[in-house]
Amino acid sequence: MPFTLHQKDSSTDARLGTLELPHGRVQTPIFMPVGTQGSVKTLHPQDLESLGAQIILGNTYHLSLRPGSGLIREMEGLHRFSSWNRPILTDSGGFQVWSLAKLRKITEEGVRFQNHLDGAYMMLSPERSMEIQADLGSDIAMLFDECPPYPCDRKYAESSLGYTLRWARRCKTWVQEHQPCSGEGRQHHFGIVQGSVYADLRKRCAEELAAMDFDGYAIGGVSVGEPEEEMLRAIDHSA
């Protein structure tokens, strides 16, 4: 994925750059409005453009329920469905599954849970998450991960990290088998660094994900109830 670094702050390592995505350029750092079900509530796509929004976020879990990823695929993707012609990032559904903690069961296969609409049981696996995001046709697809809660003891954090790394490999395999690895318009895939508040686990996760050679990397498992100082340390250990 083309990324041009324009400037880097010597004291903070903050970076100014440009991402080249299938539906346009994104100047970083950037605020990304959340369009859970394909659109940002109360705003028309033209309103977002006039406000300078360069990229929006869509939610894999919610879109898989309503209107369904199959219908969006038939509509030739989320961009056409939502009348948004600029870049879109879709999350993997992992964070929403985390929020349904009382209604879920995590196994090696994936996560079995009850959806919030009618209580029906669903299974979301790494492969299914990537398949849904491929149907949506987003510019950036996030890998399926396990977001540990806060507080979280080390034993749970280690087990959770194992899921995240093994699932990342399965996401990679699915992409290699079902999507082009190069070419104009291809979907880009981002790994998610987990490890709770444990510095060595976050370092391990970042290193192992980097070795898998994804297009980009995100910092996950923050802003889940931890104090601000813990959040800042977790970010520092992950970056």
Regions found by a protein language model. Name each.
Residues 174, 178, 187-239:
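Glycine-rich phosphate/ribose-binding loops and adjacent secondary-structure elements
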Residues 82, 184, 191:
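Extracellular/periplasmic catalytic domains that process cell-envelope and extracellular macromolecules
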Residues 1-181:
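Non-catalytic, usually N-terminal nucleic-acid engagement modules in DNA/RNA processing proteins
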